[in-house]
């Protein structure tokens, strides 16, 4: 089956104030997004895909003919695929606070004519979702077949269920949690500390210079460790050395060390350090019960059917966290089911195990809206 071909990233300019959960506001907002398929006349065949921490709106196809890689969920999007563009209108927006076209710390502050830097206000997962709702209203989407996403994207999915349940047929959170744990917060803390410790961070006012490349690269390396599993490290690298002749030298590298350094360099070339700070903090602040009562009670009468998907080897978001969401929805009188990706690839499996994901998601979507699956 062919994919979606060449796609264009578009930009929506919202000229009104966006009021944030912190009480701060943004005077205007730009949202970068991509769409696939066609919105039907009723405006009710849309699926919203939410991306993870350093992701973007480019989930499928290529932005130009010789682009090296297609979008990050390309095998799932297109005619006849799990997110079937013959039936569904697929939308993905770059999140608020990121650096792929949506307003974030690297954007120009209209009050100063300079990048926001650390003057950018604190943002939360709920703020991201409210920005996405603005975009969907602009696009004419009246109802979503589903909101779906993994990791930080799964957090957005859950908040969609709390903020706009009347607009959803169902939610599909993947490899995520209802509130971040101390371990998850701890890993983000040391990643942010790596950026702060780089003198080139300059208090966040590094635009126009090289910026904190070493700090961001180290932060990424720490993050990469949490995205894998012990079996996946063993399968990929074992104890192999880059150069066995340097076995007893401090600068000698195991292949796993070389890989981490490479991943750090890759991110530095495509991501903004301040966005990394703001987005990891938004993840740390994630708690669906914040301002809504107790965590145990907030799931009572949850209005959206839920398909929660865990990953068997996930170290960062262990499957019990998705299982807990499903259990609490069901115990509260709602309707939820659980499925699991059986994979050695750890948290990254939702970006790798496309066949398993398709086998889980596709029948669920057809069951939700048989009128669209005919």
Curated annotation (Swiss-Prot):
Q: How does it assemble?
A: Homodimer.
Q: Where is the AB hydrolase-1 domain?
A: 45-353
**Biological process according to GO:** homoserine metabolic process; methionine biosynthetic process
User: SUPFAM superfamilies per the record?
Assistant: alpha/beta-Hydrolases
The family assignment reads: Belongs to the AB hydrolase superfamily. MetX family.
List the EC numbers from the record. 2.3.1.31
Subcellular location(s): the record lists: Cytoplasm
This protein's name: Homoserine O-acetyltransferase
Keywords, comma-separated and alphabetical: Acyltransferase, Amino-acid biosynthesis, Cytoplasm, Methionine biosynthesis, Transferase
Q: Does the keyword Lipoprotein apply?
A: no
The UniProt entry's GO CC annotations, sorted and at most eight, read: cytoplasm
**Underlying gene:** metXA
| Annotated GO MF terms | homoserine O-acetyltransferase activity
EC category: transferase
| UniProt xrefs under InterPro entries | AB_hydrolase_1, AB_hydrolase_fold, HAT_MetX-like
Catalytic residue positions: 151 (nucleophile), 314, 347
Question: Pathway it acts in?
Answer: Amino-acid biosynthesis; L-methionine biosynthesis via de novo pathway; O-acetyl-L-homoserine from L-homoserine: step 1/1
Q: Which reaction does it catalyse?
A: L-homoserine + acetyl-CoA = O-acetyl-L-homoserine + CoA
- Which Pfam families does this UniProt record tie to the protein? Abhydrolase_1 (PF00561)
Protein's UniProt keywords contain 4Fe-4S:
no
Q: Where is substrate bound in this sequence?
A: 220, 348
What is the recorded function of this protein according to its Swiss-Prot or TrEMBL entry?
Transfers an acetyl group from acetyl-CoA to L-homoserine, forming acetyl-L-homoserine.
Q: Give the chief site where it resides.
A: cytoplasm
């Amino acid at each position: 089956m062919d994919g979606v071909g060449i796609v264009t990233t578009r930009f929506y300019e919202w000229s009104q104030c966006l009021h944030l959960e912190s009480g701060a506001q943004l005077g205007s907002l730009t949202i970068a997004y991509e769409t696939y398929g066609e919105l039907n006349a009723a405006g009710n065949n849309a699926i919203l895909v939410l991306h993870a921490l350093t992701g973007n709106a480019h989930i499928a196809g290529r932005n130009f003919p010789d682009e090296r890689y297609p979008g990050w969920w390309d095998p799932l999007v297109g005619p006849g695929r799990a997110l079937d563009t013959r039936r569904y209108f697929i939308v993905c927006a770059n999140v608020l606070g990121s650096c792929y076209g949506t307003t974030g710390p690297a954007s120009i502050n209209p009050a100063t004519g300079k990048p926001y830097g650390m003057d950018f206000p604190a943002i939360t997962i709920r703020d991201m979702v409210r920005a996405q709702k603005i975009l969907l209203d602009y696009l004419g989407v009246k109802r979503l077949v589903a909101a779906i996403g993994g990791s930080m994207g799964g957090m957005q999915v859950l908040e969609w269920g709390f903020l706009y349940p009347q607009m959803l047929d169902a939610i599909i959170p993947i490899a995520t949690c209802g509130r971040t744990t101390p371990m998850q917060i701890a890993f983000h803390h040391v990643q942010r500390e790596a950026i702060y410790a780089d003198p080139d961070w300059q208090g966040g006012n590094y635009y126009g210079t090289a910026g904190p490349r070493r700090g961001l690269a180290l932060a990424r390396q720490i993050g990469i460790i949490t995205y894998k599993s012990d079996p996946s490290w063993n399968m990929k690298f074992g104890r192999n050395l880059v150069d066995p002749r340097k076995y007893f030298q401090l600068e000698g590298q195991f292949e796993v060390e070389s890989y981490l350094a490479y991943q750090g360099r890759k991110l530095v070339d495509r991501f903004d350090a301040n966005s990394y700070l703001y987005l990891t903090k938004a993840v740390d602040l994630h708690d669906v019960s914040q301002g809504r009562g107790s965590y145990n009670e907030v799931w009572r009468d949850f209005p959206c059917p839920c398909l929660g998907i865990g990953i068997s080897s996930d170290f960062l978001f262990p499957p019990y966290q998705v299982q807990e969401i499903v259990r609490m929805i069901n115990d509260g009188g709602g309707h939820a089911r659980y499925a699991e990706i059986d994979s050695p690839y750890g948290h990254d499996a939702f970006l790798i195990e496309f066949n398993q994901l398709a086998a889980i998601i596709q029948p669920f979507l057809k069951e939700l809206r048989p009128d669209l699956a005919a």
